[in-house]
């Protein structure tokens, strides 16, 4: 749970159903919450965000490549996913025709688990009685886009000396590496950057 492997398995299943291709757990990039600190959560709160462990599945409409990843993300307070807490889970879907949809409910506990297992048993019994194997056919293996080729926004918090010119020096390092800075707040030593990366926060 903490390192996102459970969420990754769920994301692989959802991606397979959503995109009609076979995605397995090994295709999913994982980054858990064990490195998230109280300071990270406090900074996110000051900026109007909450930190959530998200499973994200995307498909490139041009290439058909699928990217599935699990990592901590800063979710705006006004986003529906920000209110998902405790034993509740949510699936947030964006589609061309339907726009944004969210499916919300309990994802843990005796009753929800028993309900899901019972539903699977009923499906299996119906399929056996009808001589079928369900409505999903055999999927072809997904073309997976690796995390190195995935671009996302993230926030970098730096502890720096409180003296003139420090922020200029920091931004100069990013400029040397071709990283654009959208916004910076020196009081909190925060820099918002956008660049393909292995780390997402």
Where are these regions (language model features)?
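Acidic active-site catalytic centers that drive phospho-/nucleotidyl reactions
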Residues: 6, 10, 120, 162, ...
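Catalytic, metal-anchored helix/loop core of enzyme active sites in primary metabolism
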Residues: 1, 56-58, 65-161, 167-170, ...
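Substrate-binding/catalytic subdomain of NAD(P)-dependent oxidoreductase enzymes
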Residues: 1-83, 88-90
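Aromatic/hydrophobic pocket-lining residues that form π-stacking "cages" and hydrophobic walls in ligand
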Residues: 40, 170, 193
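Generic structural signal for well-ordered, non-membrane alpha-helical segments
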Residues: 4-8, 33-37, 110, 114, ...
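Secondary-structure transition/hinge residues
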Residues: 19, 125-129, 201
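Short secondary-structure junctions
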Residues: 48-49, 175-180
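Single conserved hydrophobic/aromatic residue that forms the stacking wall/gate
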Residues: 191-201
């Amino acid at each position: 749970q903490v390192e996102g492997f459970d969420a990754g398995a769920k994301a692989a299943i959802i991606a397979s159903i959503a995109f009609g291709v076979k995605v397995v757990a090994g295709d999913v990039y994982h980054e858990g919450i064990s490195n998230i600190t109280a300071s990270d959560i406090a900074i996110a709160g000051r900026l109007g965000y909450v930190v959530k462990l998200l499973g994200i599945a995307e498909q490139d409409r041009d290439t058909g490549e699928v990217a599935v990843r699990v990592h901590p993300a800063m979710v705006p307070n006004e986003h529906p996913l920000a209110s998902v807490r405790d034993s509740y889970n949510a699936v947030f879907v964006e589609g061309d025709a339907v726009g944004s949809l969210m499916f919300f409910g309990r994802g843990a506990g005796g009753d929800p688990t028993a309900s899901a297992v019972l539903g699977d048993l009923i499906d299996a019994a119906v399929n056996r009685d009808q001589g079928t194997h369900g409505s999903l056919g055999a999927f072809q293996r997904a073309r997976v886009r690796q995390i190195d080729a995935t671009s996302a926004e993230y926030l970098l918090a730096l502890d720096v000396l409180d003296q003139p010119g420090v922020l200029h020096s920091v931004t100069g390092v990013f400029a040397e590496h071709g990283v654009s800075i959208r916004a910076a707040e020196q009081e909190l030593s925060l820099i918002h950057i956008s660049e393909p990366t292995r780390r997402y926060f």
